[in-house]
């Protein structure tokens, strides 16, 4: 028997009962703040201002557009696709944004859990075989369109979070 481990566990036992859960409003506020931070990061990349998020670009149909009604599940799926696209890009401009999307997805999962929703981890697109060719042929355009559409999607998510979206 490992007495040291047992004593250590028994010593920590009272503290485990005093741990308080983070209020869900705090999680929702953190989610909104992170969305605003990501939008600011996108705005700081100067060339993203040149394309409308609603504009159709041939060959870039796999980049999600705007969705009028977003559930937590749809938000997570959309962010998973954007994260997959951004991590495939050679540009260093998008590394922090991709990391922020991962954190945002984690916060969405906490919000879903608080609503007793089972939110499976979305994996993004089934296949991005065409992405490699698109990035080689027009990496700059892909980055501009992806960031512009991501910005629009994030602004929609921010609005939807105020309406307390469903699962």
UniProtKB/Swiss-Prot annotation:
Primary localization class, coarse: secreted
One GO cellular component, as annotated: extracellular region
Keyword line: Diabetes mellitus, Disease variant, Disulfide bond, Obesity, Secreted, Signal
Membrane-spanning parts: none
Effect of residue 100 to Y: In LEPD; no effect on secretion; does not bind or activate LEPR
Signal peptide span: 1-21
InterPro entries in the cross-refs: 4_helix_cytokine-like_core, Leptin
The keyword Disulfide bond is annotated on this UniProt entry: yes
Compartment list: Secreted
Inducing stimuli: Induced by secretin.
Tissue: Adipose tissue is the main source of leptin. It is also produced by other peripheral tissues such as the skeletal muscle. Expressed by intercalated and striated tracts of submandibular and parotid salivary gland intralobular ducts. Detected by fundic epithelium of the gastric mucosa. Secreted into blood and gastric juice.
Paired cysteines (S-S): 117-167
Disease: Leptin deficiency: A rare disease characterized by low levels of serum leptin, severe hyperphagia and intractable obesity from an early age.
Purpose: Key player in the regulation of energy balance and body weight control. Once released into the circulation, has central and peripheral effects by binding LEPR, found in many tissues, which results in the activation of several major signaling pathways. In the hypothalamus, acts as an appetite-regulating factor that induces a decrease in food intake and an increase in energy consumption by inducing anorexinogenic factors and suppressing orexigenic neuropeptides, also regulates bone mass and secretion of hypothalamo-pituitary-adrenal hormones.
Subunit structure: Interacts with SIGLEC6.
UniProt cross-references to PANTHER family, sorted A to Z: LEPTIN
Identification of the protein by name: Leptin
Organism: Homo sapiens (Human)
